[in-house]
């Protein structure tokens, strides 16, 4: 059961570099279940990988700057709710160095501490509720959906091309966090070159229309969550970023962004960074006068 909605404006498989954004922002609402405590002040200089805010309930879970630069604004809304922290990037980037670590030689607790110290733990989601994972929990399994069945969704085989080693290292790290299995879902109509040869994970082949790519659907069919149990889910690009953090010793916020839709002049994949403004991507590439709504 399901439905594939055929929308106009799919992207060509072309990855285009985009000029550096004039500002980058971390938005607490993107991290469901977190009550942010800001740990920087406006005007303060931060390195890429340095904490901008932490979770009040679990202060060991920190949310770090994607770039080095000056904190331009701590935007607040009603009742002083933190709406976003904006960083103006340096011309030359500086990174917090966490040190190269061998995943093979680490135990689960050491891997978790490495993810917490680097800020990568913030990208682990917990089911039920799809909130940021609780570091005190032990998931019964970890799930990665290797395809997105939503309309105009990015093709992971394309965006992850050439990242097989980092993906494998990320899977190796995640496997240390659970006594169960790491599960990867792929679609039968997709060759899934990136995922099918991953070691240390159980690969499952799915068939059918959307929402087959939703990780919740895959959990339901592979290892349903019973009362009192939790599983963790991770986006494939975040798995790669975890792998890079261990093999390079610095956090990587490089992410592909796909600009698609019927009002886009030339739908493309852009090589960008987490938290970047989309202004450089949409400028001159969206039909003028169109009543456009941007959906992320």
Predicted features and spans:
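Short, compositionally biased leader-like segments
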Residues: 38-41, 227
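Short, charged beta-turn/beta-strand-edge "cap" motif at the junction between a beta-strand
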Residues: 51-60, 78
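Short coil-to-beta-strand transition motifs
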Residues: 60-68
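Short, well-structured beta-strand-loop connectors
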Residues: 40-54, 73
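Short, solvent-exposed loop/turn positions at domain surfaces
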Residues: 34, 40, 57-60, 266
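N-terminal, Lys/Arg-enriched amphipathic/low-complexity engagement segments
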Residues: 1-39, 54, 206
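Buried, small/hydrophobic-residue-enriched core segments of structured protein domains
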Residues: 61, 75-296
């Amino acid at each position: 059961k399901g439905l594939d909605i055929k929308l106009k404006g799919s992207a060509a498989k072309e990855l285009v570099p985009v000029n550096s954004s004039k500002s980058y922002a971390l938005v607490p609402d993107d991290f469901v279940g977190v009550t942010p405590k800001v740990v920087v002040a406006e005007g303060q200089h931060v390195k890429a990988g340095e904490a901008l805010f932490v979770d009040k309930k679990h202060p060991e879970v920190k949310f770090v700057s994607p770039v080095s630069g000056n904190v331009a604004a701590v935007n607040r809304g009603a009742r002083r709710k933190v709406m976003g922290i904006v960083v103006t990037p340096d011309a030359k980037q500086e990174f917090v160095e966490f040190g190269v670590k061998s995943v093979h030689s680490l135990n689960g607790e050491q891997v978790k501490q490495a993810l917490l110290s680097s800020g990568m733990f913030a990208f682990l989601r917990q089911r039920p509720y799809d909130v940021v994972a609780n570091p005190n929990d032990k998931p019964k399994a970890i799930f990665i959906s290797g395809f997105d069945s939503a309309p105009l969704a990015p093709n992971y085989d394309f965006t992850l091309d050439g990242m097989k080693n980092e993906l494998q290292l990320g899977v190796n790290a995640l496997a240390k966090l659970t006594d169960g299995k790491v599960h990867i879902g792929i679609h039968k109509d997709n060759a899934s070159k990136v995922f099918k040869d991953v070691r240390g994970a159980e690969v499952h082949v799915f068939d059918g229309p959307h929402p087959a790519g939703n990780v919740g659907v895959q959990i339901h069919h592979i290892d349903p969550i019973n009362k009192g149990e939790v599983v963790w889910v991770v986006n494939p690009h975040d798995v790669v970023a975890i792998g890079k953090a261990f093999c390079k010793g610095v956090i990587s916020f490089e992410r592909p962004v796909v600009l698609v839709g019927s009002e886009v002049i030339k739908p493309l994949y852009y090589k960008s960074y987490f938290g970047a403004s989309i202004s450089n991507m949409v400028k001159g590439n969206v039909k003028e006068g169109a009543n456009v709504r941007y959906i992320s």
